[in-house]
Curated annotation (Swiss-Prot):
InterPro entries: Ta0600-like_sf (IPR023130), UPF0147 (IPR005354). NCBIfam families: PRK04330.1 (NF003319). This is UPF0147 protein TK2131. Pfam families: UPF0147. Belongs to the UPF0147 family. Gene3D superfamilies: Ta0600-like.
Length: 83
């Protein structure tokens, strides 16, 4: 697994999934994105595209705290670099 994907997974775990201020549906979506990224049976670009789709869907949630939205946007930017 690429180092970039490992870093993205770590950021999602530490700053979204484990943050109890973040609504449950957003944490669940971040967990889904992590599962997709860790599925090594698929090409890294496909995993990144699937994770982007999941995270983009929740990025506009009005209940998302602003600091979490910023983290999601940063993760989306990093995922776009995965090839």
């Amino acid at each position: 697994m690429s180092e970039l994907i490992q870093q993205i997974v770590q950021v999602l775990k530490e700053q979204v999934v484990q943050d109890t201020v973040v609504p449950r549906n957003i944490r669940r979506a971040a967990e889904q994105a992590i599962e997709v990224l860790l599925d090594e049976s698929r090409d890294p670009a496909v995993r990144a595209a699937d994770a982007i789709a999941i995270l983009e869907e929740i990025s506009e949630d009005p209940n998302m705290p602003m600091h979490t939205r910023t983290i999601i946007w940063e993760v989306l930017g990093a995922l776009e670099q995965v090839k």
